[in-house]
Amino acid sequence: MNKLMLSLSLLLIVACSPVAQEHDDLYGSGFINVNEMQWSLEHSSPYPFTVAYGEISCGFHPAFGREVYFAPEGFTDESYIGTPLNKAAANALKYDDMHSNVPYSINTGADLSVAVNIGLKVCDEQQESLKNNV
């Protein structure tokens, strides 16, 4: 009986111990916060989004490459899928039979090239972090 209790106790201790996640933030995606006021100071192109605050994020799809998305403030946790800003993101969503679930927040006729380049830069920085830290 004592061996059984000892075994169960040891199993519970091991099973409930937290796993070290020192590289959890280097999963391969990244983001940058953007806002209308700061955009006008840093970029010559007009702010392309209909909301004052949001997040440009980047991820990687094995078949389509680097994906760039925009999510308005309040829709940026992992349960949301942002609006795709580049072809890779749109193709990845279509391929995976997924859809954006955030409010569409892109100005009509907006030039998204600067926003996409910002997202791709985030991808580059994240990949560099992965190379240097793993």
Regions found by a protein language model. Give the residues of each.
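Residues embedded in well-ordered secondary-structure elements
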Residues: 5, 45-47, 112
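C-terminal partner/receptor-binding element of secreted or periplasmic proteins
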Residues: 92-134
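Flexible, solvent-exposed short loops/turns enriched in glycine
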Residues: 68-100
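C-terminal motif of bacterial Sec signal peptides marking the signal peptidase cleavage site
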Residues: 14-15
